[in-house]
């Protein structure tokens, strides 16, 4: 069995199907229109920005419009575009006086050149697609501007730490930014956490101003209750600003210091340069007494001298300095300084004293004069006296060699080596830069002391006649001795370098037999006596003529050589005309032998030796060639 309404349902189904077919066949039956619009767009001031509005899907015909939402809520239309076929027809309606004006590009996007703070609005894109419906989307435009350099104006007055409430410290300015920057304060690089509500310890106030350009300027004023520790503190402020994409920046101001007023708590009083660690100053120096209190600003100082428990005021100034030109021993004593600070606490000691001690050293006095003459081998005592404060120390030296400490110098069994300059030096151990000296010259009177020497000496018996020798005599004494030689030619006496008091003379001569017999004497003399020395040479050998011996040896050698040559020549030419002629002239009578005795050979040899030398003289053609 069918339900009662079955026929009605059966009859309605074909109608619904037909309606669906008709709607599907209608050209305006399309999907719902949707838009792609970025909800937030960020840009830096002065840069260009493009707001995108893209319909999704395919629509042959639609109308795109851009609206601006102003502060009153009104929505003036800026531009529109109509899609006809494949092209978009653009129409600008209201530029709102913007320069450069708004523009639509070929894709229906809204273009804002050189973005300004006034462009920071909501921009609405509306697309009407007929039967597909109408879509609307909003893009929020934020324009960012970096503020100018942060400026700070500190309080240039004198701020008292005795105030029990916060005082104005400085004002910080950050101008022409967007959005409005934030200002923070710093002391010695550490951020100050100060509230914005007024309280005695510190707070800050802020004020934001919109400039004619639409940019924002922020002013912050800092108030603090100051302490004495803030006298050396450095303060500054910083502006924190925002940038696109969630970034941030910071601009710090220059640092500054405050001028504070605080009472004196401690006073110092001392002797300035020059002074020694023990507190002494030298007589004649320029001395400064320095007084300093730790209050600010600098208080007034009263400098005085105590004499018989009475104050003698010497100077009153704001520097706390007292200068004593060319200080003398009479200025030794007690000096004082008082700080005139009426804001100081009752238990603070505002007065200080010190003891000025002037060191002095008078010229030294010797018991002897500048020159002391003493006989050889005698003794003497010299005293050195001095007055000074603190007690001086005395020391004796000679040629920088220490001799002893104390005022007395004892000289005993003096010799010529004792001659020289003796120095008494006085010094103050606690004042190293203060010292004096006094000296005297010791002259030892006595007969001369003599020393002799030979240059290249030889042992006894090694001298030969004609050998050259240099003799040297050296002497010392006082008065200076004179040097003389027993022969002429001695050099003048001259001081010996590096040997104080010694003079020297030299004599160069040739050794002879007479010198060997008599010797050479050198004598040193002065009014106290003389000393004499004789140089002896021992046995002197006669000089052999080496040249004559050499000539004789050569002559003998040449003669023997000529004799051998002559004999050899005659043997080779035996029987020749020359030999026969010689035999005719000098042959013995017949029957006598050629050599009758041993002595008959010598004349012939002599003749042979002489023939070579005399034959040429006799005939001009002689020589060994004419005689055998």
From Swiss-Prot:
This is Basal cell adhesion molecule. Residues 569-628 are cytoplasmic. PANTHER family: BASAL CELL ADHESION MOLECULE, CELL SURFACE GLYCOPROTEIN MUC18-RELATED. Residues 274-355, 363-441, 448-541 form the Ig-like C2-type domain. Residues 309-312 are annotated as: Interaction with laminin alpha5. It is found in: Cell membrane. Pfam families: C2-set_2, Ig_2, Ig_3, V-set. GO terms for biological process: angiogenesis; cell adhesion; cell-matrix adhesion; signal transduction. One of its GO terms (cellular component) is extracellular region. Homodimer. Interacts with ITGA4:ITGB1. Interacts with spectrins SPTA1 and SPTB1. Residues 32-142, 147-257 form the Ig-like V-type domain. It comes from Homo sapiens. Residues 609-628 have a biased composition (Gly residues). Wide tissue distribution (highest in the pancreas and very low in brain). Closely associated with the basal layer of cells in epithelia and the endothelium of blood vessel walls. SUPFAM superfamilies: Immunoglobulin. Residues 32-547 are extracellular. GO terms for molecular function: laminin binding; laminin receptor activity; transmembrane signaling receptor activity. Disulfide bonds join 53-125, 172-237, 291-337, 384-424, 473-522. Its main location: membrane.
